[in-house]
């Protein structure tokens, strides 16, 4: 009985330590996401920002998210929307390998922060991420001007 209680206490302590570690990683990575948000906000002030974003996105993805760690599926890249899915993610794979898959969600959250800097000209949307249990990480960058023109 005593050993069982000790085992439960140890598991509870370990869970608290993991939660604390995840929160510390969240705090630190959000700092970088906020810097990216500011940089995106500066970029978004430029005229024709969606066209420029669209012209550079595939090169950016190939350079910064290479095929060795990420499997990118391009769905759409036109004047209305840039949409691609990541079918595999190096961040998720590393988190799983190290026994902490829940950590990956922290990195996923930072996309929402960083890309919010593109508003109001470019709206970022997503239905889910691999880290949250979805089949893929979907990235939708919507040209807000084109969307507004439709209505």
Predicted regions mapped to residue ranges:
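N-terminal, charged low-complexity regulatory/assembly segments
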Residues: 1-12
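A short, highly charged nucleic-acid-interacting micro-segment common to nuclease
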Residues: 1-3, 46, 101
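Terminal "cap-and-tail" regions of soluble proteins that handle hydrophobic small molecules
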Residues: 3-4, 23, 147-151
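Amphipathic interaction/junction segments at domain boundaries or subunit interfaces
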Residues: 12-99, 112
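C-terminal non-catalytic interaction appendages of large macromolecular assemblies
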Residues: 80, 90-94, 98-151
